[in-house]
Amino acid sequence: MHFSTVTRDMEAFTASSLSSLGAAGGFPGAASPGADPYGPREPPPPPPRYDPCAAAAPGAPGPPPPPHAYPFAPAAGAATSAAAEPEGPGASCAAAAKAPVKKNAKVAGVSVQLEMKALWDEFNQLGTEMIVTKAGRRMFPTFQVKLFGMDPMADYMLLMDFVPVDDKRYRYAFHSSSWLVAGKADPATPGRVHYHPDSPAKGAQWMKQIVSFDKLKLTNNLLDDNGHIILNSMHRYQPRFHVVYVDPRKDSEKYAEENFKTFVFEETRFTAVTAYQNHRITQLKIASNPFAKGFRDCDPEDWPRNHRPGALPLMSAFARSRNPVASPTQPSGTEKGGHVLKDKEVKAETSRNTPEREVELLRDAGGCVNLGLPCPAECQPFNTQGLVAGRTAGDRLC
């Protein structure tokens, strides 16, 4: 397999096919149970109307509708009304309806299973939120899939993109614990595609293990030059997963639309935020994130109940355990900087522990939030926004 072939396929897919994908459609998974936290959805648009072609004989039936919903919407600006059709004898029917592209056999039989579906469903019932930062933040839950039906000896690329669910901007109403429409969406962010770092690879390699997009990061920095996915905060997005067959033919760009297949799992849609809004989402992330062990070691009653930006009931519990209070071996005071503090000084020192000060008490010299656990060489980044006042982008959780 030549590098030029892979490059051609990537360019053809990105420039031709992906640009014409719509937010709706794909090969969706089963809808998640429970009520939608964003309220009732808008009714689906009516099915397209197919008018008979002007060149067809009188009385001849027009083109039949497709047997199932075609996964991709027409490109932006494409003519959809009958008035835009060419007129006169011999006019083409192409403007009236675009026939579905027959998929290459290498991708037609591919199927995908979403991993951790039960967890995604649980988040979806609450209204999933994903943190976006200037530096980029990984998703949790991580998007992971299991693949079936690939040609073991064929080469495939796996990639993801994110499309807006609607044209609205949202805000969270804390008094009602619900999301409300705040207005029209902000201008669209630059569309980007995230290729799995193992792409391209043989079908046998993709199918033998779970495929994880744990390197994918979300950012709200419009000038990002690190290749992260750029999203608008307080907007809803739908992740999409694409399987692309690496066609060895020299003119493979001609077959770009038939060489890929898209999968959409509605339970993975989320709202991009800079700090968690729903405290139940915060609790569920703490309970289910393997890198949040330090938070789970505390009493669940210490978890934030009435969440608001800057609230710090959870971190305060840990900070108090590290404050310079009197111990049995030091009944009359506490050592600080080589001398003993009297009880009054201890009380004054403790009273100055504002939320920002408490975070500094918990953060070691390496910028790692120390929750009393051994700090490994590489701490997994963990989002403390919405939990910790005075947080910094470098905070990590041990």
From Swiss-Prot:
SMART domains: TBOX. GO terms for molecular function: DNA binding; DNA-binding transcription factor activity, RNA polymerase II-specific; protein dimerization activity; protein homodimerization activity; RNA polymerase II cis-regulatory region sequence-specific DNA binding; sequence-specific DNA binding; sequence-specific double-stranded DNA binding. Changing G337E: In a colorectal cancer sample; somatic mutation. Residues 40-50, 60-69 have a biased composition (Pro residues). Transcription factor that plays a key role in cardiovascular development by promoting pharyngeal arch segmentation during embryonic development. Also involved in craniofacial muscle development. Together with NKX2-5, acts as a regulator of asymmetric cardiac morphogenesis by promoting expression of PITX2. Acts upstream of TBX1 for the formation of the thymus and parathyroid glands from the third pharyngeal pouch. Required for hair follicle stem cell self-renewal. Binds to the palindromic T site 5'-TTCACACCTAGGTGTGAA-3' DNA sequence. It is linked to Haploinsufficiency of the TBX1 gene is responsible for most of the physical malformations present in DiGeorge syndrome (DGS) and velocardiofacial syndrome (VCFS). DGS is characterized by the association of several malformations: hypoplastic thymus and parathyroid glands, congenital conotruncal cardiopathy, and a subtle but characteristic facial dysmorphology. VCFS is marked by the association of congenital conotruncal heart defects, cleft palate or velar insufficiency, facial dysmorpholgy and learning difficulties. DiGeorge syndrome: A congenital syndrome characterized by a wide spectrum of characteristics including parathyroid hypoplasia resulting in hypocalcemia, thymic hypoplasia resulting in T-cell immunodeficiency, defects in the outflow tract of the heart, and craniofacial anomalies. Disturbance of cervical neural crest migration into the derivatives of the pharyngeal arches and pouches can account for the phenotype. PANTHER family: T-BOX PROTEIN-RELATED, T-BOX TRANSCRIPTION FACTOR TBX1. This is T-box transcription factor TBX1. It comes from Homo sapiens (Human).
